[in-house]
A protein has these predicted regions:
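Charged, terminal alpha-helix-loop-beta segments
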Residues: 1-129
Length: 129
């Protein structure tokens, strides 16, 4: 579990994602570090209308086109093993930066989006006696 993941989970309600999605919870299974047969989904969310499951993959630095295949494996698992009638699955990559390979791969993949995050670093003056 990364610091980025922890921060996003703890601050979910303060993000744009919370307007459309909630973090998936079903009985004792949660959408954080959601286990599949091809790895762990960082965050699994479900739309407020329960019609769309969103597979979120987080990358600390630069994301490249390899993450598209990883995300598609997770989305395939959700589609095959988890979706109920009428539901669909989408993917979201969140990273600090992207590269040309990722942009090319996403240009032909309509069910995966990319969002950049920004870190604000601030130094605070502290008075020590």
């Amino acid at each position: 579990m990364s610091e980025l993941e922890t921060f996003l989970i703890q601050n979910w309600e303060n993000t744009e994602l919370s307007k459309e999605y909630d973090i998936f919870v079903d009985d004792e299974v949660t959408g954080q570090q959601f286990q599949t047969d091809t790895g762990r989904i960082d965050i699994l969310a479900i739309s407020k209308d329960k019609k769309t499951l969103l597979v979120i993959e987080l990358k600390r630095g630069r994301a490249n086109d390899k993450v598209v295949g990883q995300l598609q494996r997770y989305m395939g698992f959700i589609k095959d093993e988890f979706l109920e009638n009428g539901q669909k699955v989408k993917g979201l990559i969140i990273a600090l930066e992207d590269d040309l390979g990722l942009r090319r791969a996403l240009s032909v993949t309509s069910d995966i989006e990319f969002l950049r995050y920004k870190v604000k670093f601030e130094l605070l003056n502290t008075h020590i006696n």
